[in-house]
Amino acid sequence: MKQKLNTVMLQEIEAVHSLLLELEEQHRCIIVNDIFALEACVGKIKDANKNIAYIEVERRKLTENRAMTEIVEELRDEKLESNYHKIKQLLQEVILQKDTNELLIKQGLSFTNRILNVLNPVRETKTYNAYGKVKK
């Protein structure tokens, strides 16, 4: 079981690393405003996520839905522990990159909306409601 689990974890490291590379490519596309390449990144990211999910199912079959920390402590294998920490570190990097990309996209959308409001302002008269807030 130890060898099989180690093999599956190595596959998982490779899959998560490929997802990280795709997210970095998405980041590059966001920075240079390459919309068509950004659209192509979406499909690649989905494929990488499917691959990770498949490998995760394989790992859960091997571990019988037990927690990985419990298994790593029980088996006390250096390679297994090293791979476990590599996966955790890669996952943190993926989360950071994903959050950065989402923030940049939201920032770009906010900027675009402000520019549109400057170019085409709302022509309605502003009225106040009972709470003193401006209705939109």
Where are these regions (language model features)?
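Short terminal interaction segments
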Residues: 73, 77-136
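Extended, charge-rich alpha-helical scaffolding segments
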Residues: 2-75
